[in-house]
Structure formats: structure tokens, C-alpha cells
Amino acid sequence: YRQAALANECGTPMLRAMMLEFPDDPACDYLDRQYMLGDSVLVAPVFSEAGEVQFYLPEGRWTHLWHNDELPGSRWHKQNHNALSLPVYIRDNTLLALGNNDQKPDYAWHEGTAFQLFHLEEGREARCQVPAADGSTIFTLKAKRQGNTIAVSGEGEARGWTLCLRNIQQIAGVQGGTQTGSEWGVVVSAQGNTLTITL
């Protein structure tokens, strides 16, 4: 929903041709069977009855949103999917918000938000905005990495949010929250709006 609000504010489409997001990659110029959902999520629909799909990942490392497998970029990949799955890959240095209600689309998105952090690199900062129903931003979460420390800070109103460090199964410690394990990676439950995570 935030991407739809941004499209209204800035004019950049929510569903983007690959060449729009990766203008310097010649391989993206003619791709018409996959697209970017916003600036960080790549979607490759399955057009084959057998479930076979070929798709191209631009430069970098990409993580599947649900399966959590990692694939290298700058190359083509071939996979098989069923009716309940498809390639949905997330770029590194992405902070993504997942909701906590799969029964209806309209609810308080800032309550129980499950943030997902995908491979934040040294010196990089990731940001995620959670919208209210009117499209305005009700909560903004930022994560910045310096060395082995990730500083996380939130601004605005949010309740019961968590942060999952995708494909990181162990951390040295956390200040400002508690940690638990999951199949996707360490999940940190925030006690306030700031966290300091030591990898």
C-alpha cells in the first residue's frame, strides 16, 4: 500500500518494467515476463502449465521472500513452481514490512508489523515507511550498519513490531529488545523504538 501511495505522490509506477529500475543493465532492456514491485521486490509470474519459469536477476544477491533461498544476480535462473508459489525475490539492503493480518487488507498496519531486513551491508542504511489508511506515513523504521553493529530506530506510532534478520541465525547480542530464532533468521522483538544489534 505504501508503494501505491508513493506512486500517487511521485508519479513513479508501483509495477515497474525492469529497465526502469536497472537502466544500466542491458539484459533488462527487453524483459517482459517479470517486473519490479516498487524498488526492491522482483516478481516473475509463472506462464507455463508445467510450472516452469525462467527469470533474470540483476547484479547483487537476492533472497526469496517466502522460501528464504539466496541466488546470485547478473544471471538467469530456472525454477519449477506450483499454483501457490512463484519467484518473488528481494534485493540486499532492503527493509520490508509484512503485516500481521491475512484475513483482510484494511487494518491497523502499524500494529504487530513484522519488518524483514535483507543483508544490510557495511555503511548502508535501509528505511521502511508504514502507511495509515489515508496514505500518510504513520511509522518509519531505519536500520544502519557500522561494522558488526546495526542501529535501528523508529519514528512515529507503532505497537508490537519485530525485526527479522533474514538468513542470520545467530547474533552476539541485542539492546532494547529480545531475540528468538525462526526458520527465516533471528527475530528481535522491540521493547521501544530503538534497537542496537551486535552481529
Cite the ranges covered by each PLM segment.
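Catalytic core of carbohydrate-active enzymes
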Residues: 1-158, 162-168
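Secondary-structure transition/turn motif
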Residues: 153-159, 189-194, 198-199
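Solvent-exposed beta-strand/loop surfaces of large extracellular or lumenal domains
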Residues: 65-83, 173-193
